[in-house]
Amino acid sequence: MLKIADTTFTSRLFTGTGKFSSPELMLEALRASGSQLITMAMKRVDLQSGNDAILAPLRQLGVRLLPNTSGAKTAEEAIFAARLAREALNTHWVKLEIHPDVRYLLPDPIETLKAAEVLVKEGFVVLPYCGADPVLCKRLEEVGCAAVMPLGSPIGSNLGLRTRDFLQIIIEQSKVPVVVDAGIGAPSHALEALELGADAVLVNTAIAVAHSPVQMAHAFRLAVESGERARLAGLGASPFNPSQPDTLQLRATATSPLTGFLSQLEEQDHV
């Protein structure tokens, strides 16, 4: 079981709604995935229509909808989108996305942290999409985010866990769920993330653009379940299993430690 804020999920596969060829195919694939948390971009929803082509089918699934602020380029724009989503969809959950660079869609760390602080104070359950930066993820946790969503590689790239070493540090130090988001292009990538210790993954492009999105959604479902079972079973020691502390050294060692230097300064202060 995975708990985020006040909600418990039995599925660790979260899914998106973009790039599907039709709402009907999207709905069928999402059902096959078993996902219980589905994200949707507010910019793609017609809030004036009670029968929106995206929103109406999603409501049939009986899952938690996670509106995202994709398209926002500043903290102010993201905060506005989150407030709009809360009013229109009656939810205080939001996936915080701020990426001003339209070429690579990399998240803006400064604006993301600014927006997260405001939204948390306003009572939102904030799940921020962010770079695989252990320091930033810790700061987002400290301001009250319910989870962190570091990228595996750029959105839609299908490159997998190119940030693996940093993801490991984030997972090791995080006290909130870690959801690997972006770049997961194959079920094997999702399995790897769960084996690494991630609490969940979010997948969109790899499912939506597959030759058979329904079959691919089911494949991701099985991969995530397998990855979680393998982690719980206890993976044996190997260079590919960083959960075993003796197999991989990630902690930094300074080439010029300041310990002695700082001690001398302290002694001089007391003289």
Curated annotation (Swiss-Prot):
CDD domains named among the record's database cross-references: ThiG
Major enzyme class: transferase
InterPro entries: Aldolase_TIM, Thiazole_synthase_ThiG, ThiG
Known EC number: 2.8.1.10
Catalytic activity: [ThiS sulfur-carrier protein]-C-terminal-Gly-aminoethanethioate + 2-iminoacetate + 1-deoxy-D-xylulose 5-phosphate = [ThiS sulfur-carrier protein]-C-terminal Gly-Gly + 2-[(2R,5Z)-2-carboxy-4-methylthiazol-5(2H)-ylidene]ethyl phosphate + 2 H2O + H(+)
Keyword terms: Cytoplasm, Schiff base, Thiamine biosynthesis, Transferase
Keyword Oxidoreductase among record annotations: no
Compartments, as annotated in UniProt: Cytoplasm
Disulfide bonds: none
Active site: 95
One of the record's GO molecular function terms: thiazole synthase activity
Residues engaged in binding 1-deoxy-D-xylulose 5-phosphate: 156, 182-183, 204-205
Pathway note: Cofactor biosynthesis; thiamine diphosphate biosynthesis
Highest taxon in the source lineage: Bacteria
GO biological process, one term: thiamine diphosphate biosynthetic process
Signal peptide: none
Transmembrane parts of this sequence: none
GO cellular component, one term: cytoplasm
Stored PANTHER family: THIAZOLE SYNTHASE
Family (UniProt): Belongs to the ThiG family.
Subunit structure, as described in the record: Homotetramer. Forms heterodimers with either ThiH or ThiS.
Protein's job: Catalyzes the rearrangement of 1-deoxy-D-xylulose 5-phosphate (DXP) to produce the thiazole phosphate moiety of thiamine. Sulfur is provided by the thiocarboxylate moiety of the carrier protein ThiS. In vitro, sulfur can be provided by H(2)S.
Protein name: Thiazole synthase
Organism: Yersinia pseudotuberculosis serotype O:1b (strain IP 31758)
Gene symbol of the encoding locus: thiG
